[in-house]
Amino acid sequence: GDVAAGASVFSANCAACHMGGRNVIVANKTLSKSDLAKYLKGFDDDAVAAVAYQVTNGKNAMPGFNGRLSPKQIEDVAAYVVDQAEKGW
């Protein structure tokens, strides 16, 4: 995915709950690398695919963005989230 494009998708669609890699709904489930690895199935094998799956389908309080974002936008925002998690937000 395109990390720069993903940054703008994140800003428009995700930042309300996940600004700076945080989670305003469930504080202990952040977008840190360790939390993503703990809560997302398959993160250690393919981090971008695991984040893209979560964004597409949602889970618990998080809505799915399938139909609201294109597959490319989802791939891009997943690449951005993983990139930021690697950098420690």
Curated annotation (Swiss-Prot):
Heme c binds at C14, C17, H18, M62. One of its GO terms (biological process) is photosynthesis. This is Cytochrome c6. It comes from Limnospira maxima. Functions as an electron carrier between membrane-bound cytochrome b6-f and photosystem I in oxygenic photosynthesis. Binds 1 heme c group covalently per subunit. InterPro entries: Cyt_c-like_dom (IPR009056), Cyt_c-like_dom_sf (IPR036909), Cyt_C6 (IPR023655), Cyt_C_IC (IPR008168). The keyword Heme applies. The lineage of its organism: Bacteria, Bacillati, Cyanobacteriota, Cyanophyceae, Oscillatoriophycideae. The keyword Isomerase does not apply.
